[in-house]
Amino acid sequence: MKENDKYEQFDVGEENNKTKRSKLDADQRRKYRIIIILLILVSLSLAIMLFCSKRKNENYQNGPIDKDSLKFLLISDLHDNEDSLALLLNKVKQNKYNYIFYLGDFVKMTPGQQNSTEHANIYEERMKKYLQKFEQIAPVLYIPGNNEPYTIYEKNSPKLTEISKNIHNRYIKIKDDLYIMGLGGCVPILNGGKYDKNVIPFSTLNTSNVIQNGFPYNLPEYGLDNYKKSDEWYGNDIKNIINEVKKDAGNNQYQTILLSHNGPLYSWTNAQQQLGTGEHWLYLGSMELEKILINDENLILDIHGHIHPSRGINTMIPGKTVINPGAIINGFYGELTLKKIDNKWTVNSMNLLEF
């Protein structure tokens, strides 16, 4: 082979190597570009998900108002009436709320059904269905009334949806200085006499005159002391929640709102005139709750249901407000707005509404 041929052969080989390297570099660049594009797409997807999650959280947790205002939809006593539910949802679908406060009696069960596991599963599914419909408007903080399955009152009650919370015998902090406490169920009903809504007559009512049992707060084994013992149990549960809130708050200032099914005993929002008896009244609330409202300076509101015809707002106890928004089954609901003024949450507006 000639010397020049050697050089020519060498040059051709070098060119082949360059071509291979060039092709390899192109393949690597192509792979890098694909990886970069994928990383960009993943980053964009995560950013979109985070944005949507933040928007959803803002809609639910911070609501439609500024940081020093809160708006709530107050509802109670559906009793399985899906027509009323549809009418309510249509009425409020354009409104914005931080939370819905549901005050018990989603369903209507007989006492025999309430303690049945078979019926519990059926009625839990109904409650889940109703909650999911309410969640189209806002997340729900709810308590059972006196018509739910026994499982809903238990410490380890089933989680019916991912968004809403059962706060029976619990509390939730919705602001650094504002707690929502919950206690569902009811105490026995007392058969009273003439009612005076301007008096809190703790000593004048015959607490042995029970005409209907409570649920789950009912201790018939005590006979004539059924109401008294059941109400002590009910009151102790409220006090236990209050103590848990105190521990959580530490030395920080705070206020509380109680969601209950029955209200304080002598509030006119919790009394019902007995039909056909003139001025004879039924007392359907808790004496212990009344005392707690009077004595607990941090508790500013009790919002309750239970007594369908006695909707209203009671401010008889100084500095405290008791609200019964009425029953959905009768076409009633309420809207409550709180505003923070001088570092204190106060009732800015309370509207009793109907559909």
Task: Put a short name on every predicted segment.
Residues 179-280:
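Active-site-proximal loop/helix segment associated with metal-binding centers of metalloenzymes
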Residues 107, 113-124, 250-298:
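Active-site-proximal segments of metal-dependent phosphoesterases and phosphodiesterases across multiple
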Residues 82-175, 283:
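Core catalytic region of metal-dependent phosphoesterases/phosphodiesterases
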Residues 72-82, 107-122, 190-205:
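Acidic/histidine-rich helix-loop elements
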Residues 2-74, 78-86, 93-95, 136, ...:
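Acidic, histidine-bearing metal-coordination/catalytic regions of metal-dependent phosphoesterases
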Residues 62-73, 171-182, 253-257, 314-322, ...:
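Beta-strand-turn-beta hairpins that frame and shape the catalytic cleft
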Residues 74-77, 100-105, 139-146, 166-169, ...:
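Active-site neighborhood of phospho(di)ester-bond hydrolases with catalytic His/Asp-centered motifs
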Residues 171-176, 287-296, 308-355:
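Binuclear metal-dependent phosphoesterase catalytic core
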